[in-house]
């Protein structure tokens, strides 16, 4: 059983995001870039399935500029068998990402595709669903538990009413929630081994996919600064303050 894991590079979640002076985007030059936390969980789950003897190969893939090879080596150090780097300097929106992953699916013929339910840079939560639709295969999103047996994946997901369990035939697409697992710690020997693992490089144009934006963001702006809070002694003073501001 082969598992393909989508493994996106994003601005590290500890970085304080700065908007460019012209409002055209956020500053990414010189800031720390890290694997998308949801995709790390997806990779960890794929590795656990391999550790159990259910999967035989885990392939990690990313769509990113040429300098993202270190990012993929991180995935190889976690334990992936090999990596695929689809190179493009253009921003890739969810639909283009799904189309690119579909090309990799057609090339690799995986039994399962796992990716994070969303990326923390855009929070779109669209790529997995779009890939499943383009592929014509079942999907199970927001997975908090995954079991694979007899050509089926049983996925538990958290919904507003409690827990929901889905059973889907393989091949399928699964997107992961934060509660699914805790990614493993990468040890130094694993980092050294990753340097010799296969890493295939493809150009996005080779796959016949255009990275052009279907959705254009006209401008970016930081959140408006909040005004200083006002302390009140009791409910009556609170009501008076709200009336003064025209809120009541």
Which ranges hold each PLM region?
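N-terminal glycine-rich FAD/FM-binding segment characteristic of electron-transfer flavoproteins
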Residues: 1-248
